Design a protein with these regions (language model features):
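Generic non-transmembrane alpha-helix signal with a bias for helix starts/N-cap capping motifs
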Residues: 59-60, 138, 162
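Generic detector of bulky aromatic hydrophobic side chains
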Residues: 9, 40-42, 49, 109, ...
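Beta1-alpha1 glycine-rich phosphate/pyrophosphate-binding loop at the start
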Residues: 1-79, 168-177
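Residue-level detector of alpha-helix initiation sites
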Residues: 9-14, 35, 114-116, 136, ...
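Glycine/Thr-rich phosphate-binding loops of Rossmann-like dinucleotide-binding domains
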Residues: 118-119, 163-165
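FAD-binding core/adjacent interface of flavoenzyme oxidoreductases
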Residues: 1-4, 64-156, 171
Length: 177
């Protein structure tokens, strides 16, 4: 049985690990368009706030360690662009090389994550306005806060990540609204 999983952070990585426990002979390929898999999303604000001091502590698994533990082939920087459900095939873009190829599957699991909502407000694209969804966003926010005298911050969103972001900006001494 050939499983293809789209998305390699929380849901996709958990699905891959569970599949391996259920079927030791399955071929499992996990595609992640980002650079990292299986990282602690809820830890991102705590890295920005300095509670987690070492960036590497955000990562639960690497593609190599995930393969060694679960025999799951992980392809980072690989974006699934098209699904042909009838032919049971996905079209994948290798973001490093720019090449496109197809991968066949017997079963497909979709766990691509979410995109932050950026309301159509004037100035939303200005410098110093961020969204927080992944490690790259975290690096941008931390670099900005480390290199500037940030006088205040506004956090829009009161989910777990928004609340933790407010907590950790406050921890850095930045007044938060």
């Amino acid at each position: 049985m050939m499983y293809v999983i789209v998305g390699g952070v929380a849901g996709g990585a958990s699905a891959a690990a569970r599949l391996r426990r259920l079927d030791e002979t399955a071929e499992i390929v996990l595609f992640e368009k980002g650079e990292y898999i299986s990282y602690a999303n809820c830890g991102l604000p705590y890295y920005i706030g300095g509670v987690i001091e070492e960036r590497e502590r955000l990562f639960v698994q690497t593609p190599e360690s995930f393969y060694a533990r679960f025999r799951v082939e992980v392809r980072v920087k690989s974006e699934v662009k098209r699904i042909d459900a009838e032919a049971k095939r996905v079209t994948v873009s290798d973001l490093n090389s720019g090449k496109t190829y197809e991968e066949s599957y017997d079963k497909l699991i979709l766990s691509p994550g979410a995109e932050p909502v950026r309301p159509p407000l004037e100035g939303i694209g200005e410098e110093g306005i961020f969204t927080l969804r992944n490690v790259a966003d975290t690096d941008r926010i931390k670099s900005w806060a480390d290199s500037r005298n940030v006088r205040r911050a506004v956090v829009v969103g009161a989910g777990f990540i928004g609340l933790e972001m407010a907590e950790n900006l406050h921890r850095r001494g930045i007044p938060v609204s």
